[in-house]
Amino acid sequence: TLVANLPDIKTESEKEVALPPFLIEKWKKEGRYEKEMASLDAFFKITGYPRAPKYYIIKWLTDYIVEFGIDGYRADTVKHTDEKVWAAFQKECNYAFGVWKKNNPSKVLDNNSVYTIAEVYNYGISGGQEFDFGDKKINYYQNGFNNMINFEFKWDAQKDYEFIFSKYSSKLNNELQGYSVLNYLSSHDDGGPFDAKREKTIESGTKLLLSPGISQVYYGDESGRSLVIEGTEGD
């Protein structure tokens, strides 16, 4: 599975660690060791963070924002990391975005901050701001995310239009006010999509695009491409 193959980086740790030798070797071969080390030194001096694994990752991801002006991140398998890391991540993303805007005034489109979306597997809008692990509940919205993928929408799509609109409007204008959800009907790792045979394409599109929240359009949603293909395996 995906999770079984993820790198075992201890995002909950605050313990300082050295860079892995293979990365140092790579940088030296590429002739950029001194530049990368100076950049790391500057980041840790400005932020005051310890040189723990998560802060290295935050630094490298926010470098993309400074260089390219990336204005959003979609984080995968969030439940398998320590939730507090994302608050620090969002903070540094917004700082980096400010640096990019200052350096590129002619390219600035608006005053928005970096937009962050969390994939917390099986989160549904009915849970409001919290995801229930069974033994604990975590509020990812208050730990650095503007939006969470809503795994519940494909089930709600089986209901009528009034039910969907009323439910989602109520949720997003009350306990989720200021935040949002990302709705989908089919996805690469969801084995039970709504209308897999694409027999309700107009209904699917209407519900997905007109329901409160953000819409994810998956490959084939727009063209009615069937998801039932004999002989296929995996994603």
Which ranges hold each PLM region?
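Substrate-binding/active-site clefts of carbohydrate-active enzymes
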Residues: T1-D63, E67-F68, F89, C93, ...
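Short loop/turn segments at secondary-structure transitions that flank enzyme active sites
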Residues: K15, N122, W155, D190-G191, ...
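Active-site rim elements
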Residues: F44-P50, R74-T77, D189-E199, G205
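Active-site-proximal helices and loops of the catalytic beta/alpha 8
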Residues: K59-V181, K197-K200, T206-S211, S223-D235
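Catalytic grooves of carbohydrate-active enzymes
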Residues: I65, S187-D189
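Short, basic/glycine-rich phosphate-binding loops at helix/coil junctions
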Residues: Y184
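Hydrophobic, well-ordered secondary-structure elements that form the walls
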Residues: H188, L208, G220
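Acidic/polar loop patches that form or flank catalytic/metal-binding clefts of enzymes
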Residues: S215-D221
